Amino acid sequence: TSVTGVQTCALPISKVYSVLGMLDAKNPLIQTRPFRSPHHTISATALAGGGQTLRPGEISMAHRGVLFLDELPEFHRDTLEVLRQPLEDGVVSISRVQGSVRYPSQFMLVCAMNPCKCGWYGDPSGRCKCKQSGIDKYLGKVSGPLLDRVDIIVEVPAVKFEALSRNDTDEPT
């Protein structure tokens, strides 16, 4: 019998959720890879983990799955910076007066962001009225060292609904 990737991940994923007391007694193993999408107002502690009980944070809850950060520049910069070491090492290290813990953090980071504060920069309609200094400030909220740890960056232009809903049979599938 072969073991699928999800089956080999079930125990490490379940261990993190066990520490949090989030396992179901009837189904003690999590059989799906996690997808975590914290709000941009999340604190650095909630993202990385810690607090009085040294709990795992969203980063470790995404272990062997996806951590999706929508509206990336809207996150506090200090919150984003806690991603750097876990992305590099695959582990979150937390040290407090109560002690030290290490939680696994091998996750795929997926981020989304607008090209400027209004979201229209580069759109052919010319709807963006942002000044270059505002665009630079907005994009500058994400540090270079964090972006260095992002393997693929893709610009996706807006596509009108009509273009998506057309029934073009001329295009190859």
Regions found by a protein language model. Give the residues of each.
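P-loop NTPase nucleotide-binding/switch module
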Residues: 10-60
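AAA+/SF3 P-loop NTPase mechanochemical coupling elements
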Residues: 35-36, 55, 59-64, 94-114, ...
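Short gly/ser/thr-rich secondary-structure transition/capping motifs
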Residues: 48-53, 90-95, 133-137
